[in-house]
Structure formats: C-alpha cells, structure tokens
Amino acid sequence: MIIRSPEPEVKIVVDRDPVKTSFEEWARPGHFSRTLAKGPDTTTWIWNLHADAHDFDSHTGDLEEISRKVFSAHFGQLSIIFLWLSGMYFHGARFSNYEAWLSDPTHIGPSAQVVWPIVGQEILNGDVGGGFRGIQITSGFFQLWRASGITSELQLYCTAIGALVFAALMLFAGWFHYHKAAPKLAWFQDVESMLNHHLAGLLGLGSLSWAGHQIHVSLPINQFLDAGVDPKEIPLPHEFILNRDLLAQLYPSFAEGATPFFTLNWSKYAEFLTFRGGLDPVTGGLWLTDIAHHHLAIAILFLIAGHMYRTNWGIGHGLKDILEAHKGPFTGQGHKGLYEILTTSWHAQLSLNLAMLGSTTIVVAHHMYSMPPYPYLATDYGTQLSLFTHHMWIGGFLIVGAAAHAAIFMVRDYDPTTRYNDLLDRVLRHRDAIISHLNWVCIFLGFHSFGLYIHNDTMSALGRPQDMFSDTAIQLQPIFAQWVQNIHATAPGVTAPGATTSTSLTWGGGELVAVGGKVALLPIPLGTADFLVHHIHAFTIHVTVLILLKGVLFARSSRLIPDKANLGFRFPCDGPGRGGTCQVSAWDHVFLGLFWMYNAISVVIFHFSWKMQSDVWGTISDQGVVTHITGGNFAQSSITINGWLRDFLWAQASQVIQSYGSSLSAYGLFFLGAHFVWAFSLMFLFSGRGYWQELIESIVWAHNKLKVAPATQPRALSIIQGRAVGVTHYLLGGIATTWAFFLARIIAVG
C-alpha cells in the first residue's frame, strides 16, 4: 500500500476585479505591446499587430495571466459559435422550405437562401421542387432538424432566439471571468477536478440529456413522420414530455414508467432502445432507436468515468501517479515529468488536443457516409459529399495545428535542464534515426505508388492492357482490406451474436438500401484501383508527417543551427553570412507541412467523390437494376494518371465550366475566381523581397515629387509575411476551387 501525505483541499479561488474594464485601452491598437502601442512608423506595424494580437505569450510571461486570457477568449469563441448557430436556425425559420421538405424529402431539395432580384442575380434561385425556388444547401441541417424532432419553422425561430441569448451569456461570461472574478492559476492546473467535471458533466450529462430528448421527443415525432402523418397534426414536443399516455400509445412499455428500470427488467425498454445495426429502409439513416440506445450507453460510461479522479475525498486516480507509473523496460523514466509539462505549457496541452480532435474529425468524415446518422441524409448526395469534404479539411488543419503548437512548446516552454531520460528526451536523442527512417519510407512509398500509375500509363499508351495492373489483367487486390470488410460483414451471428445486421452496409454481405428510387448505401467493392490510390494516401500522409515531425524534433536545435531555440519559433534565416539557413524555423515546417496536408486531403476527397459516384450513388429501377452516376468507371479509369485527369477532373468539371446562364452559375464564377486566388498566391510564394522593395521605393519617390507621400513608410512584406500570405491564398484558392467543382457537379447530376 502506498502511504501518501493528505492532499490539499481543492478550493475554487478567484481574484476579484483583477483588471479594470477600459474602453480607452481597447481603442488603442497594440495596447498589449510597448513597441506596437507607439503607433506605425512603417507598414510592417499592421502585420505585427495581427501577428501578435492573440499571441498571449508575447504580452506577458505570467502563466496565470495567460491562462485567464485564453479562458476568457474561449467564452468569446463560444459566443461566436452560438451566433453562427443562431444564424443557421434563423435562415431555416425565415428563408427556407423546411416544412415542405419535411413533407416530401425524396422529391424536394433543401434550400434556406433566396437571392434578391438585383442585377439578374435571381437566376441563382433554382427549382428545388415543390414550387420553391432558392439556392440548394448541402449543410445537412434539415436532416439534423428532422432527427431532433423539429416540425415547424416556429420551433426554428425559438431555437434561434435561444442561441442568441446564449451568445450574449457567453460574451458576458468572457468579460466576467477576466475582469470581475478571474480564476487563480491553481484552478486551471487542477486536472482531476477538470476531468471529473468535463467527463461527467459535459460528456456524461450532455449525452444523457440528448438521449432523453431523443427518447421523449425525437423518436415519437419521427415515428409519425415516417408513417406519413402531416407535421401539423403531430403533437408538440412538450405534449410528449408531459403526457406519458401519448408515448405509451407508440411504445407500450412507457405505461410502466421507471418500474422496469428499478426492478432490473430492462428488456422491457427494448422497443425504443434497440440494437439493430444497419439502416432504416424508410429514411436510409441509422435507426434512431439505435442512436438513442448508443447515447444512453455513452452517458453511463462517461458518468462513471467522471467519478474516477481523486479530488477532496482521497479516493480515485491521481494523474501524476498514473503518468509516473507509466514506464516499460525500454523507456527509461517513462512519462515522469509529463504532468508538469502539461500543467504549465498550454501549447503542449493544445497540441495533444488538436492531434486527437483532428484524428476524430477525420473518423467522423468516414462515418458520416458509411453510417449516415440522420434521416434522408444518405440520398442527399450533395450533402454527403460536402460533409465528407468539410470534415476531411477540418481534420487536416487541426493536425497541422497540433504540430505547430508542439513546436511552439519545444521553443518556448521546454526546459532541457530538468528533463533527463524521460520519453520525450529519449525521442529527441534518437531523432536522427526517426527522421531518416521516415524519409526512407516516404521515398519508398512515393516511387512505388507513383511508379504503379506510371507503369499503367505507359502500358496504356503502348496499347498493352494485358500488362497493366488492373482487375482484368495483373491484379493487385487489397486483400487485407477485403479481409477486414469480410470480418465485419459476417460479424452478426458470429462475433456479435446479438446484432441483426453489421455496423455498416459498406462492409458487404447485405442488400442495398434505396429510398425513393435513389441508392442510400450498398456494399462497397474494393479492387486494384483502390489499392493503387490507397498507397498514394499512405505516401502523402507520411510526407506530411515527415515535414511536421521534423519541425517539432528540430525546433530547438539542429546540426546546421545548434542555437535555434534562441532564434524563436519563426525566423527567416540565421542571419547574414550564414548561407543555406533559410526556411529552417519551426514556423517554416508548419508552412511547408500545410502544402502537403493540402495534397493529402485533395487526393482523399477526389478518391471519395469518384468512388461514390462510380460504385455507390445512383438510381434503382422498378426491376431492381442500379444505374450509377458514372457507370462504375472508377475501377478501370482511375488506374492511370491520364484516367484521373480525363475521366475525373476534366469529365466532371463540365458541369461547373458550363454552368453559366443556369442556377449553378455562381459556382462557375467561384471556380474562376478561386483559381485566380490560388494563382495570386504564387506571386507571394515565388517573390523576391528585394524586387518589391525597389519597386516600392520608386513609387514612394513619385509620391514625394507630388507631395502626396504618407507619413507611414511603405515596406515590402518580410519573407515570413510573404509566405504566410502565400500559403493562405494557396489553400483558400485551392479549397474554394474544389468546393465549386464538387458542388456544381453533384447538384447537377445527383
């Protein structure tokens, strides 16, 4: 038994009125920095103002003050999120065809934006069905609202107003907890209390309340909707909540109330807490009763998890003990010291959170189509494509952010003198081995994955299809992926005897699900084409990781620049007289990593878009014959680079290129404009700073001649500013181009 000294009691301590509220301060740009507060001498001032406004580390070195600023900023962020949500719900209430869509979701498209007739813009209001003209939306809000049990635009109005109230509340909380009652540092560092509250409160009670809402409101309302009852005839949510007999008509066990729960006769609740698997054939979404069951189960798990950590009662886990006990035979001191790192460096903490949240977001992208959670989501191809693309991009950005903050931690917060032989130290000591091996893997993957395509292009050009890698010639079947698919397809009755169907139709085995003559989902076959593009995914992901990881591991020092830590997180070069030392800062690795993240995600969303159009999405005739959008051409066309260019990019761009004069013409303009934004980025990425400074000086000379020179001297962008502007426009242009290409295509053919 471990004897430990009694822990200090956890008390919530705040400082009263620590910082006075001052509008004068607010109105003075750069008030947080002595240099910036003086005002501009040159145009560089405005860049530094933007770079440092939210870099709280540069305002003060006091961890408590930094923590309070971050905490307060989080409330501001939540306020903006509530405002945005309120806007979404308001559009649904004021400008949408939600009620019409609800009555006939298979023939009417979702729209929540009607363009005013100014200079002919009303051409954008396409016919979405049911006599409504507007812009077709692909956000999935209609499907989400239906799943929540929202049946009228009035309910959307009320929710929008509620969200505004919460936005105001959050704004107030941000001010209050910085200016009136600011928590002490000890409060921010009390990880056990934080874990208990977040796990039991946010996740546990949050899931429980959602499960309760689903059982008492969503399930009965969706039951009526699925049966074709007019939304106006359906009882209102509060009637279901207050009147148990109403629910008992749909689910008889409701008449017994909580008795089965306390008598452990839980199977009585199996009417509305199911374990079916698969999709509801009426809506093409997961069974809402499965989803309610899932949230109830998750709630129980998190409520238990929220009681595991030791606070004032002397029982439970201590995070520090867990981390320090975490060592194996080959890991030296293991995680000793990690507790101190994560409670004093918010960059280290944020880095872990971003990495996990980014990975989770990408997992969400893959589940939204394979297990579509909301009714009529699976047959809304535009929304399916948008949700996948959106979650992939977001996940990519979050993971790059994880590397960025890990590197900032290394430069600003890592103290090498106190770390010896723990896991982080051991990783840093053999970083050369890690990076050189990773580099070898990248070279191997790059040559081999691309080489397979080049081989196919060459054989195709020489007219030798029998010598190509394809399903009909030299097969490279993804046998491991097919094995995983098969395990999951055969799980019901074998490894998961309680389930009636497998978790997802995509595994195989089952029949397809079609709603209103459109395919919702079917078993997805994998072949040589998928094997090839999968290895391109492996290649681009490994290169992204190589760049980002090198940036983190060499953030403080390298053979080239041993004192890199003294130069900071971002610097252009190691000073004059040190040639070949540009683009070595940790910031530059993030900059370069962003381009490879963009490459990686682009290939993923292209693969998804084409694969789904070729092998999944389409129509089904009365005889049961499925006609896919691109007729199953993925397997034979995507095995050459030429096929990707000709049969995917070029063939599917026809809708966006020919969109002029139609309701999709805005996408044509965006396609053009975003290409322009992307090209504009190259001007910054390939620029020579001196060239612009010379040009500026001759323009300033002309202004002086005419006596119209400004007091603030113009300066060319610094090297890092130029790169920042360049990568921003590169990503913005590239993503918006892809967005216009995808949506014009899928709205036209889907």
Curated annotation (Swiss-Prot):
> Sorted alphabetically, which PROSITE patterns does this protein's record hold?
PHOTOSYSTEM_I_PSAAB (PS00419)
Task: Tell me where in or outside the cell this protein is found.
Answer: Plastid, Chloroplast thylakoid membrane
Main location group = plastid
Catalytically driven reaction(s):
reduced [plastocyanin] + hnu + oxidized [2Fe-2S]-[ferredoxin] = oxidized [plastocyanin] + reduced [2Fe-2S]-[ferredoxin]
The protein's Enzyme Commission number: 1.97.1.12
Instruction: Summarize where chlorophyll a' binds, as residue positions.
Output: H675
Transmembrane ranges? 70-93, 156-179, 195-219, 291-309, 346-369, 385-411, 433-455, 531-549, 589-610, 664-686, 724-744
Q: How does it sit in the membrane?
A: Multi-pass membrane protein
Source organism superkingdom: Eukaryota
Q: How is the cofactor bound?
A: P700 is a chlorophyll a/chlorophyll a' dimer, A0 is one or more chlorophyll a, A1 is one or both phylloquinones and FX is a shared 4Fe-4S iron-sulfur center.
Q: Which family does the entry's similarity section mention?
A: Belongs to the PsaA/PsaB family.
Q: What does this protein do?
A: PsaA and PsaB bind P700, the primary electron donor of photosystem I (PSI), as well as the electron acceptors A0, A1 and FX. PSI is a plastocyanin-ferredoxin oxidoreductase, converting photonic excitation into a charge separation, which transfers an electron from the donor P700 chlorophyll pair to the spectroscopically characterized acceptors A0, A1, FX, FA and FB in turn. Oxidized P700 is reduced on the lumenal side of the thylakoid membrane by plastocyanin.
Oligomeric form and interacting partners: The PsaA/B heterodimer binds the P700 chlorophyll special pair and subsequent electron acceptors. PSI consists of a core antenna complex that captures photons, and an electron transfer chain that converts photonic excitation into a charge separation. The eukaryotic PSI reaction center is composed of at least 11 subunits.
Protein name in the entry: Photosystem I P700 chlorophyll a apoprotein A1
Organism for this UniProt entry: Hordeum vulgare (Barley)
UniProt lists the gene as psaA
